[in-house]
Swiss-Prot record:
It comes from Candida albicans (strain SC5314 / ATCC MYA-2876). Disruption phenotype: Highly sensible to fluoride. Growth is inhibited at more than a 300-fold lower fluoride concentration than in the wild-type. Has increased intracellular fluoride concentrations. Fluoride channel required for the rapid expulsion of cytoplasmic fluoride. This is Fluoride export protein 1. Residues 94-100, 165-185, 251-256, 312-338, 390 are extracellular.
Length: 390
């Protein structure tokens, strides 16, 4: 018998099918590798964040502070980092906010915080001996590291300021500037412009910091346990000294616009500590959604809206403002920049976005931004449209 001949078209079809199967297999392998890398990244970031977060349902182990953990080193290092953090943020904002700029200087503060956070999260060499000696279960449990990430970076960046700026652009309520959009719908474009620019640059900053860490690690020394204890004690003492100096300055020097800086230094540690404990106790409650950071950002944004209303709100009938006392205004500014700035964070928010899988990352980011913005609209927007803001 003679075997049937295969036509050229059938042969070509078989080859195309084999090629497609190979492409599908390559795509499946690539996605599997990408998924594995995401899991490794999530596990690494979760252990590197002092607050931690539950990136998968299977990781249900809580990271609560227990009675045996040393509270004072963690608390005082966060206090120390938060005070320097609010000073850096206010300084950067003062230097980079100018007439004619579309965005306020908080964009550069958030960028700087995310670069440092990226360096800290990916940097391993400096802490490697402490981890090898099993003094700490992971990098996130080291008090000085907690002060650097949660205290300093978390306070240099401010989530609430970004949302407030997005509202001011969308509602055309910038202080002393009115843009007079052709119609209200252009406010949506302004909102998107602020959000995309602010968080886009912050995400880029974190990615840059992670890349820089590979270079910086080559030049960092290995810190021994003895040297680390000196660093930890020094940081704790400086934290106490800064608090004492701040209280003395507030009590002795009763005049000057710089009082808003001292009030910010006073309130910032309270905001940072509240954020830390909210994240510590709530981040593991919901899988793939850092509830603690979300709660801190939402609460801080609502409080910032209330404080802004008190500072800028007009009285009914337009006969004056709600708050006119100079010291009261300085206290409100201190609460804005200090407490709300310390309570809300972009740097930790961006780290969590990197640590979640793509779908959950977009869900977490979108819900956080929209819910916080809605809260500001309800508080500031309703008052602005019914009574008015200065």
């Amino acid at each position: 018998m003679v075997a049937p001949l295969v036509s050229e078209s059938q042969s070509s079809s078989i080859e195309e099918t084999d090629e497609q199967q190979q492409q599908y297999q390559q795509l499946a392998r690539r996605r599997t590798i990408q998924s594995d890398l995401v899991d490794i990244e999530a596990e690494s970031i979760s252990s590197a964040l002092p607050e931690g977060f539950n990136y998968e349902k299977k990781t249900t182990a809580t990271r609560f502070l227990d009675k045996t953990q040393k509270y004072y080193p963690v608390i005082l290092n966060i206090v120390h980092g938060a005070i320097w953090g609010v000073l850096v943020r206010k300084g950067l904002m003062s230097l980079t906010t100018y007439s004619g700029s579309f965005l306020s200087g908080v964009i550069w503060a958030n960028f700087a915080a995310c670069v440092v956070m990226g360096l800290a999260i990916d940097g391993e060499v400096f802490w490697i001996r402490l981890l090898e000696e099993k003094d700490y279960p992971n990098k996130g449990a080291i008090p000085v590291y907690t002060g650097l990430t949660t205290g300093f970076c978390g306070t240099v960046s401010s989530f609430s300021s970004v949302i407030l700026e997005a509202f001011n652009k969308a509602a055309d309520t910038d202080i002393g500037v009115r843009h007079h959009y052709p119609n209200g719908a252009y406010g949506i474009m302004q909102f998107l412009a602020v959000i995309l620019a602010q968080f886009g640059l912050s995400i880029m900053g974190f990615h840059m910091g992670k890349q820089f860490s590979a270079v910086v690690d080559n030049y960092l020394p290995l810190v021994t346990k003895r040297i680390y204890k000196v660093l930890e004690l020094t940081s704790m003492i400086l934290g106490v000294v800064l608090v004492v100096i701040t209280c003395i300055l507030i009590g002795v020097k009763k005049q000057g616009s710089w009082r808003s800086w001292t009030f910010s230094m006073l309130f910032a540690p309270f905001g940072a500590l509240l954020r830390y404990y909210l994240s510590k106790f709530l981040n593991n409650k919901v899988s793939n959604f850092p509830l603690g950071t979300f709660t801190a950002n939402f609460l801080g944004t609502l409080l910032l809206a209330v404080f802004t209303l008190l500072a800028r709100g007009k009285l009914p009938g337009g006969k004056g403002h709600i708050v006119t006392n100079t010291i009261a205004l300085h206290v409100l500014e201190g609460l804005d920049d200090g407490f709300c700035g310390g309570l809300t964070t972009v740097s930790t928010f961006v780290v969590e976005l990197f640590g979640l899988k793509t779908l959950f990352s977009y869900r977490y980011g979108t819900i956080s931004i929209l819910v916080c913005f809605a809260g500001v609209v309800l508080i500031l927007g309703s008052y602005n449209w019914s009574v008015g803001l200065d």
